[in-house]
């Protein structure tokens, strides 16, 4: 199908706390859209406050997809996401509505928009072994090991990104080939829609840091720690030998809350650790987004008129986009 005849979709990308949720809701109301979540934390039931999951009122106003797909003791892969998202997008297009992809999980976006390389499946035993090594030598030490066996991947993966270090070493150990080899293979089927990629990101780092801090404080006031206590109390979670290895618990904020509730440090120390971890996540997200050469960048507060023109130019005119909040 020629590119100019494919159905339209927009991808609202950006670091955490940059305003994607608010803009997605506005765009859905204005252009008769439905929102497809591209967030690896929002797929888990019970992760509400700490994941900034759209509330009941938002979900009643605009249809949302790919929320609450798994329980927190389960695993959900990028390949599963790509298949589920492709199906949701096809259904949205069939209804004559606009698919709005909104989130900040780079692996999910790449899997959907570019296709996945043929990576080996996850291996629980290999992951457990790598996690045990991290307890002994630290993730920086494992990053050094990765640099020896796969310098290409090590150059892309930061030493403070344990999840990607673990996955890269896991792939190497179970397949005998570096993850960069698998990632260089031709990707799978690409998405048959024409997508405008929009990146929301404050130009000043201090602005984003302030939004992150204010959002965490709001989450704490809303009962974030009580939410984590509820997840911890689930019988299936109590049966997990190492819950910190679960993707749901590794989500930023949840991991630090889990460790705090295990007795690690004071409440103030937990808050500082959660803010720092969220800043590191935002930094990694911005690094990934800079590689999206066909994306249009906008400051969520300063570039409202430019953003308006970009969306209208791609989708057609409707009433003006309102000022986005910091969700």
UniProtKB/Swiss-Prot annotation:
GO terms for molecular function: ATP binding; tRNA dimethylallyltransferase activity. Residues 39-42, 163-167 are annotated as: Interaction with substrate tRNA. It comes from the Bacteria. ATP binds at residues 14-21. GO terms for biological process: tRNA modification. Substrate binds at residues 16-21. The keyword Lipoprotein does not apply. Its EC number is 2.5.1.75. It catalyses: adenosine(37) in tRNA + dimethylallyl diphosphate = N(6)-dimethylallyladenosine(37) in tRNA + diphosphate. The keyword Magnesium applies. Pfam families: IPPT. SUPFAM superfamilies: P-loop containing nucleoside triphosphate hydrolases. CDD domains: NK. Its cofactor is Mg(2+). InterPro entries: Dimethylallyltransferase, IPT, P-loop_NTPase. The record marks 105, 127 as: Interaction with substrate tRNA. Keywords: ATP-binding, Magnesium, Nucleotide-binding, Transferase, tRNA processing. Belongs to the IPP transferase family. Monomer. NCBIfam families: miaA. Catalyzes the transfer of a dimethylallyl group onto the adenine at position 37 in tRNAs that read codons beginning with uridine, leading to the formation of N6-(dimethylallyl)adenosine (i(6)A). This is tRNA dimethylallyltransferase. It comes from Xanthomonas oryzae pv. oryzae (strain PXO99A). The gene is miaA.
């Amino acid at each position: 199908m020629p590119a100019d005849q494919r159905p339209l979709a927009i991808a609202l990308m950006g670091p955490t706390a940059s305003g994607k949720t608010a803009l997605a809701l506005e765009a859905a109301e204005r252009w008769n859209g439905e929102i497809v979540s591209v967030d690896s934390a929002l797929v888990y039931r019970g992760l509400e406050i700490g994941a900034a999951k759209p509330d009941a009122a938002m979900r009643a106003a605009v249809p949302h997809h790919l929320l609450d797909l798994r329980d927190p003791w389960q695993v959900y892969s990028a390949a599963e996401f790509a298949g589920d998202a492709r199906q949701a997008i096809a259904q949205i297009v069939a209804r004559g509505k606009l698919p709005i992809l909104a989130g900040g999980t780079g692996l999910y976006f790449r899997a959907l928009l570019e296709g996945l390389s043929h990576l080996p499946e996850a291996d629980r035993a290999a992951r457990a072994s790598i996690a045990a090594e991290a307890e002994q030598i630290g993730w920086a030490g494992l990053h050094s090991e990765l640099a020896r066996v796969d310098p290409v991947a090590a150059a892309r993966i930061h030493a403070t990104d344990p999840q990607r270090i673990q996955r890269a070493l896991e792939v190497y150990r179970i397949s005998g080939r570096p993850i960069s080899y698998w990632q260089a293979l031709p990707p799978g089927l690409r998405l048959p829609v024409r997508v405008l990629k929009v990146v929301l990101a404050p130009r000043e780092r201090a602005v984003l840091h302030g939004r992150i801090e204010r959002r965490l404080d709001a989450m704490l006031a809303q009962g974030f720690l009580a939410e984590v206590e509820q997840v911890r109390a689930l019988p299936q979670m109590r049966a997990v030998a190492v819950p910190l290895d679960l993707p749901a618990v590794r989500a930023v904020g949840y991991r630090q809350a889990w460790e705090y509730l295990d007795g690690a440090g004071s409440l103030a120390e937990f808050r500082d650790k959660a803010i720092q971890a969220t800043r590191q996540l935002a930094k990694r997200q911005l690094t990934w987004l800079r590689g999206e050469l066909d994306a249009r960048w906008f400051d969520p507060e300063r570039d409202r008129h430019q953003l308006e023109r970009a969306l209208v130019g791609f989708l057609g005119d409707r009433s003006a986009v309102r000022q986005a909040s910091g969700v």
